[in-house]
Amino acid sequence: MIDATAQIHPTAVVEEGAVIGANVKIGPFCYVDSKVEIGEGTELLSHVVVKGPTKIGKENRIFQFASIGEQCQDLKYAGEDTQLVIGDRNTIRESVTMHRGTVQDKGITIVGSDNLFMINAHVAHDCVIGDRCIFANNATLAGHVKVGNQAIVGGMSAIHQFCHIGDHCMLGGGSIVVQDVPPYVMAQGNHCAPFGINVEGLKRRGFEKKEILAIRRAYKTLYRSGLTLEAAKEEIAKETEAFPAVKLFLEFLEKSQRGIIR
């Protein structure tokens, strides 16, 4: 079904069965599969390929040569109808690739809202990405990676399968991430190592000074006290009742499956 207000260039191909919402713009030489749903106000500039099953929300802008919803690069994939779901108001720049999920996981790749994916960024199968994140040029997420809200992943960075990146993290360019990065942490390198709290980012996002100080205390307890991980968690737990931000930090540590960067 194509809404009457949608604008589709004569050279674009939209397969029968695709659902195209109000005020959608599909530019020259785009291809939209039959199992695709595109929400109101989204724009495909030109030469964009969208395969399905894929659902794209409202007011996204997808630039030329992006490949959205293609089958994954997992050798176990056998043609199953797995999904990609994208939220609202994302900017997806040139040559970005986003793949559908696998049945070995939950069968779905999820991208939240208000994210920026710069040129050549890659989102592999079964990734889960929050809201208001930035992925710089050539940032690469392997399969099953989870990224929290308002994280920044620097250019040319690569994140190993199953790693988790916490809320408000900032990864420097060229980082190789093979373990989980706790919330609020700045990290960089090969292999990626922590070097402090994303203080400036937290200030910009409205965190109070006392909250930031509490987060810094938790960081120092974890990384600079010389305590074991279990002992550090016990110390950090003492501030979780007063500071929900510290509680989030501790919960991340407790849930980590791959271990945290050190």
From Swiss-Prot:
Listed EC numbers: 2.3.1.129
GO biological process terms on file: lipid A biosynthetic process
PANTHER family named in the record: ACYL-[ACYL-CARRIER-PROTEIN]--UDP-N-ACETYLGLUCOSAMINE O-ACYLTRANSFERASE (PTHR43480), ACYL-[ACYL-CARRIER-PROTEIN]--UDP-N-ACETYLGLUCOSAMINE O-ACYLTRANSFERASE, MITOCHONDRIAL-RELATED (PTHR43480:SF1)
Keywords: Acyltransferase, Cytoplasm, Lipid A biosynthesis, Lipid biosynthesis, Lipid metabolism, Repeat, Transferase
Recorded catalytic activity of this chain's protein: a (3R)-hydroxyacyl-[ACP] + UDP-N-acetyl-alpha-D-glucosamine = a UDP-3-O-[(3R)-3-hydroxyacyl]-N-acetyl-alpha-D-glucosamine + holo-[ACP]
Protein family (similarity comment): Belongs to the transferase hexapeptide repeat family. LpxA subfamily.
Annotated pathway: Glycolipid biosynthesis; lipid IV(A) biosynthesis; lipid IV(A) from (3R)-3-hydroxytetradecanoyl-[acyl-carrier-protein] and UDP-N-acetyl-alpha-D-glucosamine: step 1/6
Protein name according to UniProt: Acyl-[acyl-carrier-protein]--UDP-N-acetylglucosamine O-acyltransferase
Entry's Gene Ontology molecular function annotations: acyl-[acyl-carrier-protein]-UDP-N-acetylglucosamine O-acyltransferase activity
Main subcellular location: cytoplasm
Cellular compartments per GO CC: cytoplasm; membrane
Oligomer and partners: Homotrimer.
Subcellular compartments: Cytoplasm
Physiological role: Involved in the biosynthesis of lipid A, a phosphorylated glycolipid that anchors the lipopolysaccharide to the outer membrane of the cell.
Transmembrane portions of the chain: none
Cytoplasm in keyword set: yes
Taxonomic classification: Bacteria, Pseudomonadati, Pseudomonadota, Gammaproteobacteria, Vibrionales
